[in-house]
Amino acid sequence: MAGFSYLFKNRAVFPFASYAHIKAWAKRFQTLPELIRRNRRRYRLVKKSACIDERAEIGQVKAGGNKKNLKIGAYTFIGQVEFSLHDQIVIGENVCVNDGVLFLTASHDLKDPEWKHVKSPIIIEDYAWICTNSIILPGVRIGRGAVVGAGAVVSKNVGDYEIVAGNPAQVLTKKRTEKLEYNPCSFLAANRAWLIG
């Protein structure tokens, strides 16, 4: 939701010079520097061939490798994360990726005497939540609405609505609700200033 055109078009409107009008514009000006930074981050990645929806929120991302391997859907929040783009990383819509997450799309073949480079894509489905300091290894698919607990190391696929934690990541007994309608970007102050006032 960081796109200026989207926020301006969908902004909350209040009677001119009313308390709500003045308060909303004060918040908008106060949060403008962060909004500009997030738009620049997204623009820089898109300029290098990444496919990022205008309504996605991009934090301080470190992206090594071919940027065209990165695809991020609408209303997805990406914190301070690191992408290893040797192969595709596809992140769906309404996904929340917290700070410190590392996405690795390549490793080495331990059975090969020449220790060859092996790469494989990572797929994150809609409404997934990847918590702080998790590591997502090559070839992993994280299902719709799945949760990866803080510090988890994910080397195997995570099913829809499953909750995993630990090193290596293990499925917990409880499942997440399947009725998901939230937008992780709507909680950011800059977006709230425009959309709510």
Language model regions located:
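Domain-scale signature associated with acetyltransferase and cell-envelope carbohydrate enzymes
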Residues: M1-L104, L110, D126-Y127, R144, ...
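Short, surface-exposed alpha-helical recognition segments that flank or form part
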Residues: K67, K119, L137
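Glycine-rich NAD(P)-binding loop of Rossmann-like domains
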Residues: W115-I124
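Beta-rich strand-turn-strand
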Residues: T132-K156
